[in-house]
């Protein structure tokens, strides 16, 4: 509101039914809100560089943690801010493939009877393909089922079992040599049934569990981690130039995933935080029709 000939701010406020002090307070609040929204916008852009498909609900919680619950808009207003700034997300398509036609021994599913209450009690492993300009490569993952932390990974140009063993050895390196009491769960892929892989587990006291009915829910945590990497890193990006670029980008994403990305299924903790805890974790996961594609 500007002063014009014959109509100053005081008179204009009186005509509109509020005081000049109220006008200046409102203008100050508007300015502060715009400054905060610009800060939130820059923070969201920074986080999306690490995780291009990070959803609106998680971003809202992360902004409240960064700027304070009393300053950040409510959830619905935050979603509107994302919409105004063109920061809402499209829905991604899931993709999956598996093959277990081989001569090696296949173990029964004992993981379905286990509800871990600490880390390094149940590991789940899987392999997913990553497209690059030269064709594709393969991401071998070992994930802790309690904390959802990725404890071992390897990106390779082939499906040879030695690369799955490399990811497993990385997981063993952080857990220690004695795996007594740990259950390792996977699909029936030849890599996990191979003599080399089985030896590394059984020689350290681990028990082996495998899916039985070709049902993705039999290895749900591993499938979910695959989906997060695909939907939040791979699908939104241009195709990786080569395996070296893919390895670098995936490595950075896994660091972000473990250390910064909260999960509803573990009480909105990060996997690294949950990995240090003991006891049941709160599962906040449910369908949120009010979140849309955020």
Show the residue positions of the predicted features.
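RNase H-like polynucleotidyl transferase catalytic core
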Residues: 91-97, 183-188, 202-221, 237-241
């Amino acid at each position: 509101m500007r002063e014009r000939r014959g109509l100053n701010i005081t008179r204009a406020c009186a005509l509109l039914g509020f005081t000049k002090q109220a006008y200046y307070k409102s203008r100050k609040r508007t300015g502060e809100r715009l400054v905060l929204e610009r800060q939130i916008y820059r923070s969201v852009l920074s986080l999306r560089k690490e995780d291009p498909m990070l959803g609106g609900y998680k971003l809202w919680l992360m902004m409240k943690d960064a700027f304070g619950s009393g300053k950040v808009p409510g959830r619905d207003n935050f979603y509107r801010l994302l919409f105004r700034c063109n920061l809402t997300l499209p829905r991604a398509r899931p993709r999956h493939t598996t093959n277990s036609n081989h001569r090696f021994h296949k173990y029964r599913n004992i993981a379905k009877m286990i509800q871990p209450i600490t880390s390094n009690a149940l590991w789940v492993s899987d392999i997913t393909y990553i497209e690059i300009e030269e064709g594709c490569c393969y991401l071998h993952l070992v994930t802790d089922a309690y904390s959802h932390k990725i404890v071992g990974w390897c990106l390779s140009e082939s499906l040879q079992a030695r690369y799955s063993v490399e990811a497993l050895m990385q997981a063993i390196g952080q857990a220690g040599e004695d795996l007594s009491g740990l259950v390792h769960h996977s699909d029936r892929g030849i890599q996990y049934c191979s003599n080399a892989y089985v030896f590394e587990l059984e020689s350290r006291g681990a028990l082996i569990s495998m899916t039985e009915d070709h049902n993705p829910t039999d290895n749900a945590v591993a499938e979910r981690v695959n989906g997060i990497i695909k939907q939040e890193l791979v699908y939104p990006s241009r195709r990786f130039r080569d395996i070296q670029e893919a390895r670098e980008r995936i490595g950075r994403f896994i660091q972000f995933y473990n250390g910064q990305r909260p999960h509803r299924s573990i009480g909105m903790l990060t996997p690294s935080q949950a990995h240090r805890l003991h006891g049941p974790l709160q599962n906040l996961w449910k369908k949120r029709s009010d979140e849309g594609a955020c």
